[in-house]
Amino acid sequence: MSPSLQEGAQLGENKPSTCSFSIERILGLDQKKDCVPLMKPHRPWADTCSSSGKDGNLCLHVPNPPSGISFPSVVDHPMPEERASKYENYFSASERLSLKRELSWYRGRRPRTAFTQNQIEVLENVFRVNCYPGIDIREDLAQKLNLEEDRIQIWFQNRRAKLKRSHRESQFLMAKKNFNTNLLE
């Protein structure tokens, strides 16, 4: 082996190799911090925690797992039982639930909006008149109904999809009825 290759081999043995593009490095899991300050995302449905209660900085408390245990994936993939038991031993059930809640906004999920009967009646009345309301109408509705405008926009999208689905089903039933009567004649 040439001397330069021997030096390279010795350097590799003495120094642990770390890639700047490794998953641990990108996610910041290689840092020895108990608390990683985060910028506040616009997620009004997300639970927030403040680090001191006074400054209002968001803080995600993620305990560092002991060496040899990899950090659990945020994506819900089935894990082999032996790996799952390692996590169960390290994190308590309440810690796992808390961590899942804190990271849930990464998956893009939000709690389902529960509309009151009054809100549904008002939205249905507007839908009967105009199933494609403009931004000005949606903003007025949002203010009157104490909802966010984007929730109202989604409600109208879902309502139009429901109307289209029911129209398609009624067309199918009429065609089926006509087909059956033609067969009997």
From Swiss-Prot:
UniProt keywords, alphabetically: Developmental protein, Disease variant, DNA-binding, Dwarfism, Homeobox, Nucleus, Transcription, Transcription regulation
Effect of residue 149 to K: In GHDPA; unable to repress PROP1-mediated activation
DNA-binding region: 108-167
Effect after changing residue 26 to T: In CPHD5; the mutated protein is associated with impaired transcriptional repression but not DNA binding
InterPro entries per the UniProt record, alphabetical: HD, Hesx1, Homeobox_CS, Homeodomain-like_sf
Gene Ontology molecular functions: chromatin binding; DNA binding; DNA-binding transcription factor activity, RNA polymerase II-specific; DNA-binding transcription repressor activity, RNA polymerase II-specific; protein homodimerization activity; RNA polymerase II cis-regulatory region sequence-specific DNA binding; RNA polymerase II transcription regulatory region sequence-specific DNA binding; sequence-specific double-stranded DNA binding
Localization (cell): Nucleus
Cellular component GO terms, alphabetical: chromatin; nucleus
One Pfam family, short name: Homeodomain
Signal peptide range: none
Alphabetical list of SMART domains matching this protein: HOX (SM00389)
GO biological process per UniProt: brain development; camera-type eye development; canonical Wnt signaling pathway; cellular response to cadmium ion; ERK1 and ERK2 cascade; forebrain morphogenesis; gene expression; gonad development
Domain of life, per lineage: Eukaryota
Family: Belongs to the ANF homeobox family.
Biological role stated in the UniProt entry: Required for the normal development of the forebrain, eyes and other anterior structures such as the olfactory placodes and pituitary gland. Possible transcriptional repressor. Binds to the palindromic PIII sequence, 5'-AGCTTGAGTCTAATTGAATTAACTGTAC-3'. HESX1 and PROP1 bind as heterodimers on this palindromic site, and, in vitro, HESX1 can antagonize PROP1 activation.
Subunit structure, interactors included: Can form heterodimers with PROP1 in binding to DNA. Interacts with TLE1.
Protein name, as recorded: Homeobox expressed in ES cells 1
Protein encoded by which gene: HESX1
